[in-house]
Amino acid sequence: MNIQALLSDKVSQALIAAGAPADCEAQVRQSAKAQFGDYQANGVMAVAKKLGMQPRQLAERVVELLDLTGIASKIEIAGPGFINIFLDRQWVAEKVEYALTAPKLGVAPVEPQTIVVDYSAPNVAKQMHVGHLRSTIIGDAAVRTLAFLGHNVIRANHVGDWGTQFGMLIAYLEKMQNENASDMGLSDLELFYQQAKKTYDEDEEFALRARAYVVKLQSGDEYCRQMWRKLVDITMAQNQVAYDRLNVTLTKDDVMGESLYNAMLPEIVADLKAKGLAVESEGATVVYLDEYKNKDGEPMGVIIQKKDGGYLYTTTDIACAKYRYETLGADRILYYIDSRQHQHLMQAWTIVRKAGYVPESVPLEHHMFGMMLGKDGKPFKTRSGGTVKLSDLLDEAVERAGKLIAEKNPDMPADELKQVINAVGIGAVKYADLSKSRTTDYIFDWDNMLALDGNTAPYMQYAYTRVVSVFRRAGVDETSLTLPLVVTEDREATLATRLLQFEEIITTVAREGTPHVMCSYLYDLAGLFSSFYEHCQILNAESEEIRQSRLKLAMLTAKTLKQGLDTLGIQTVERM
């Protein structure tokens, strides 16, 4: 049930009937204050200006023509021409009843699209670190949200699995006479990488051999391919442990590494030349873009093939977009990559559009994000200044949550305690990130993220346990609630209306890739339920009808909190 969309349609019809153009915008919004109704239509002023009318006069005409019979109990004009809409409580009650039993909480089915979501993208032969966290969990929240709405979502884990580093690793493994890479853990590989890089920088003979292995690998040499495959498999097996701990939906089947596009690169360079988009410049192949200027004000040159024949990330990203449209059949392509890559992506996509590889009708969207910072406002590091490994961060989260939860639950069975601690610890790290606007940097703070009050995972998880505890105490389940829902008290109406706004929220998150909007909604919902619970008797209500009615509101609150948190990849618990 998308009330905003319903009211927008009704107000638009009335505006058009009053003489507005067919493309007019009703600008229906949720009201910020109860005195202005549940919704407010703000589009009259802009339309009145176009029509040369007084806004108030047009608003009066729109209200005359606005048919909200059975939906609104009152419609008012405020100020110069705002239209305030107060929802009918009987209508609200009926819609809550529907949401309780309907699939997906009454969220309307969408026209399914094939949507490719590019996220996580760790590098082979390196452990995941905190720098991978934002892409991984924000991207996964988008995937979960889009899938919930009914879209065909293709997860694309653009793993860094190609390049000169593999020549170094294979050469160094050989040098160390440790060719059986399957016996190594990833920590060994990371150390090997560091030592290989040091040797590569200091030993010219070794560097030549490493470069030779790169050529052999690229030409399909069986030995090099086997070693490369082992390195990839070991890395992704370790990464899967992190994904599982994070409750992220990525699996090995979602890996679409850089190597996937290798065969396409020569064809793309040849095609861009044939189309007159790419030219030779000092031995390299370059695309000059008028849309981007260098410091001299001339079109910027984007290299797609070096003079030694090597390709660049831009070439791979062009191939990647082409593949996602032509082979995967994408209707929409989303990239969860940090903001520092924005110009690089825009240049690649400009070439993609000019070449006709992806039509304008298929959006290419960079859902960029800022950095995770320490309390000092600098990039989050270990005390010694090193990069924080993701596994270490998650270990600490669980350890800290353990102290918090064990103190409060001395009698909880060990298995349940372990599950709760894990859900709270991992949830705290994820929610702290997801609750911030992804476009901004944010401060990583253990105390804030594990707090049992405020907009945190522990608070939200505890709020959920409070709601479900009502049913344990009442000794009822959904099937025993047979009496109709009635909404009479203001707090009942406020909670019920907010519950019905779930579809508006999840639609916004799906459109804009902004999970913090869901976090804000759930936090608000938890607060409204708390107020309702304190002021409206549930178990000791004055009549059985009111008791069952309020239990139904509590039931939909529990379902909405659980579903909302699930779209964020946050696990709920029954006790805490």
Curated annotation (Swiss-Prot):
PANTHER family hit by this protein: ARGININE--TRNA LIGASE, CYTOPLASMIC, ARGINYL-TRNA SYNTHETASE
GO cellular component term of the entry, any: cytoplasm
GO molecular function, a single term: ATP binding
Segments carrying motif 'HIGH' region: 124-132
Enzyme Commission number: 6.1.1.19
Organism: Yersinia pestis
Keywords in alphabetical order: Aminoacyl-tRNA synthetase, ATP-binding, Cytoplasm, Ligase, Nucleotide-binding, Protein biosynthesis
Catalytic reactions of this protein: tRNA(Arg) + L-arginine + ATP = L-arginyl-tRNA(Arg) + AMP + diphosphate
Pfam families the record matches: Arg_tRNA_synt_N, DALR_1, tRNA-synt_1d
Cell location: Cytoplasm
Keyword Protein biosynthesis (UniProt): yes
One GO-annotated biological process of the protein: arginyl-tRNA aminoacylation
Enzyme class: ligase
Name of this chain's protein: Arginine--tRNA ligase
CDD domains the record matches: Anticodon_Ia_Arg (cd07956), ArgRS_core (cd00671)
Stated family: Belongs to the class-I aminoacyl-tRNA synthetase family.
Assembly mode: Monomer.
